[in-house]
Amino acid sequence: MKPQHTQVPMSTKVFFGLGMLAMQMFPAALGVFMVVLVQDFGFDPVMWGLIFFLPRVVDAITDPIMGFISDNTRSRWGRRRQYIFVGAIIMGITFITMWQLYPENGLTYNFWYFLILSVVFYLGLTIFSVPYVALGYEMSTEFHERTRIMAIAQWIGQWLSLIHI
């Protein structure tokens, strides 16, 4: 997407902001539904802590790598769009799949299943979110306009994810 020197239309800001919903809603929902793992599946606090901690460690490592990849991509679709698309698909499929847990599989199996799929989910989130946020900053070359774009996107993402939960 080429940087614009003029004001970005409000409709563009709002539609861009809807993408922020995915970045806010899925991790928030993951935290809320984590209670199911503790109460219904008997995950102890150490397991619960590892499920929260380890995927975020992987996320912290992969975010800068994804930024480098996205910044240095040259394709007919641009630097960002294909990653946003692929990341959204990975996030959606993984989020649905990770909750397919059954008590009869056993505690250890369910723990590893959920942990591995949580890591895959956060990889999808990285593939989606890093180029997505960069795309928002590339929509305008003007500082205040970029600030407005991201403020609207954050507002939409935060409020709609709260309504969802």
Regions found by a protein language model. Give the residues of each.
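Membrane-embedded alpha-helical bundles of multi-pass transporters/translocases
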Residues: 2-163
